[in-house]
Swiss-Prot record:
One GO term (biological process): translation
GO molecular function, one term: rRNA binding
Name of the gene encoding the protein in the UniProt record: rpl24
Pfam families reported for this sequence: KOW (PF00467), Ribosomal_L26 (PF16906)
Keyword Hydrolase applies: no
SUPFAM superfamilies assigned: Translation proteins SH3-like domain
Family in the record: Belongs to the universal ribosomal protein uL24 family.
Lineage: Archaea, Thermoproteota, Thermoprotei, Sulfolobales, Sulfolobaceae
Designated name of the protein: Large ribosomal subunit protein uL24
Organism: Metallosphaera sedula (strain ATCC 51363 / DSM 5348 / JCM 9185 / NBRC 15509 / TH2)
Length: 111
């Protein structure tokens, strides 16, 4: 189960392709930072921290006092998903279910 803290909006291209606006972030998704000092940085999600609602992005690090690099944790609401990892069949089912539900809602509003 994906924590409600870990839901992020899809990019405009993905939103049109999949017919939904947001989905839970998973490891190996590609995201773009949309707020803060690291605005515009794009990379692959390496770790997900459901308890704090934050993620670690490949290449987004800082150095500790002793010189070892550590990931900068970014809140999931401050990123935009640019590429989905669809290797998991359960996630494909979630995407299909959300997309069909979205189409039904749009069809009902048009009438």
């Amino acid at each position: 189960m994906v924590s409600s803290k870990l839901i992020a909006p899809l990019s405009d291209e993905l939103a049109k392709e999949y017919g939904m606006k947001r989905i839970g972030i998973r490891k190996d998704d590609t995201v773009r930072v949309m707020r803060g000092d690291n605005y515009g940085f794009e990379g692959k999600v390496t770790q997900v921290f459901p308890e704090s609602g934050r993620i670690a992005i490949e290449g987004l690090t800082r150095k500790k006092a002793d010189g070892t690099p550590v990931y900068i944790k970014i809140h999931a609401s401050k990123v935009e998903i640019t590429k989905l990892n669809t290797n998991d069949p359960r996630r494909k089912d979630i995407i299909n279910r959300k997309a069909s539900r979205q189409k039904e809602e749009q069809g009902g509003k048009a009438q």
